[in-house]
């Protein structure tokens, strides 16, 4: 029975040490520009769609915004010091498009924006920390949204190419790992179907999400083409994209549940990776969506296949059990089309895993191993970086700072997920690195500052001071190789 299978999957793996990972394995922390930078209108930066969206009353749970965020724009040297003190060898951050091109068009290059990221990159390298740079983490220049409709317009592909080119030209001599897009699914679904993320569109939920994803895939391939033709030989870097996936486990042995679970993954990973690897969307998506799913020309297919990726980034937090259902009202058109139910409760009443603060996040450590194995098998054993993994605590104002700093559940989460990552390596998956989300507590999109994902606590009431949590100290010990393993030599 699948029920027994699920319970077997929950077996606690052996304790994991730094020595369970290759010596060349990269450990880092991750952030994104809008969530941490602040300085929203400083240094000649143009407004982004998230600047505009958060300034609309009622869009963010606690009425907050990222105008200041955690003020990384002014405190980046302090934050880089923290990364170094904790022992991480890499830092994944994103560049704000409108800090480089204020209007998004490339008609004006903002030298102050270039200088900021140059200084950040140089500060990292001085500390021996490698920069992993995301070009697009959701903060589209608002002028592109207002002037051409943003990602719904095919012209966005060329504008993204111009922006990527400028970043490669200015930073690529020192940046050796580029990520074109972060979680393009979220831009498509939460931005253009459900409407809870900027630009907040839900007027055409059957059309726009798939148009937006279509253009994102082509934009990725365009950036890869530019990098490979103009920069790769001289700069020697690599380029990929980061996709998000909750693992989908069939809720029973029924064939229809197994097919539904496969379909659920097609609507996550396959949506963006299949066109780049196979030349088209998954058949299950075409079957469910019909003509609402755009078609690639033969020339575009060839272009995508030639400009896919050097590595894949996986953002993974949680998993679900999947049952096939037909004609059941779902939370959005996107889920309605998939004809399935995402389940968190086992037949015996137990949850699939312990829930974190966010209602979508349950700790299901075996799911990351299954996701990694799936990606490796389907896409011919690509190098994979886990570019985000972590969990959040609630901040409703009731807990003391002392309690917030002693984040035992986060430590347990990282221990169990890292154990499954090391097992995936033993399975033969080519995993190159792991980035914890996140370095700092920060602006958690529609949830504002009510959710805390950081290894480092940010005191929003007292000058945004930084205080490492227990999880930060755990990682520091782990990276030194002596977590629960005193005195053992690497």
UniProtKB/Swiss-Prot annotation:
Binding site for a beta-D-glucoside: 35, 137, 182-183, 317, 388, 437, 444-445, 453
Residues at the active site: 183 (proton donor), 388 (nucleophile)
Induction profile: Accumulates upon rhizobacteria-mediated (e.g. P.fluorescens WCS417r) induced systemic resistance (ISR) in root trichoblasts and, to a lesser extent, in cortical cells.
Group of enzyme by EC: hydrolase
Keyword Membrane: no
Xref: InterPro entries: Glyco_hydro_1, Glyco_hydro_1_beta-glucosidase, Glyco_hydro_1_N_CS, Glycoside_hydrolase_SF
GO CC term (a single one): cytosol
Protein EC: 3.2.1.21
Thermal effects: Optimum temperature is 40 degrees Celsius.
Knockout mutant characteristics: Reduced secretion of root-derived phenolics upon iron ions (Fe) depletion, thus leading to their accumulation in the root interior. Impaired P.fluorescens WCS417r-mediated broad-spectrum induced systemic resistance (ISR) against several pathogens.
Superkingdom per UniProt: Eukaryota
GO biological process, one term: response to bacterium
pH relationship of activity: Optimum pH is 6.8.
Residues of the site described as Important for substrate chain length specificity: 342
PROSITE patterns: GLYCOSYL_HYDROL_F1_2 (PS00653)
Reaction catalysed by this enzyme: Hydrolysis of terminal, non-reducing beta-D-glucosyl residues with release of beta-D-glucose
PANTHER family: BETA-GLUCOSIDASE 42, GLYCOSYL HYDROLASE
Stated role: Glucosidase that hydrolyzes scopolin and various beta-glucosides, cellooligosaccharides (mainly cellotriose) and laminarioligosaccharides. Can use p-nitrophenyl-beta-glucosides (pNP beta-Glc) and p-nitrophenyl-beta-D-fucosides (pNP beta-D-Fuc) as substrates, and, to a lower extent, beta-galactosides, beta-mannosides and beta-xylosides. Involved in the secretion of root-derived phenolics upon iron ions (Fe) depletion. Promotes disease resistance toward B.cinerea, H.arabidopsidis and P.syringae pv. tomato DC3000. Required during rhizobacteria-mediated (e.g.
Family listed: Belongs to the glycosyl hydrolase 1 family.
Name of protein: Beta-glucosidase 42
Species of origin: Arabidopsis thaliana (Mouse-ear cress)
Lineage: Eukaryota, Viridiplantae, Streptophyta, Embryophyta, Tracheophyta
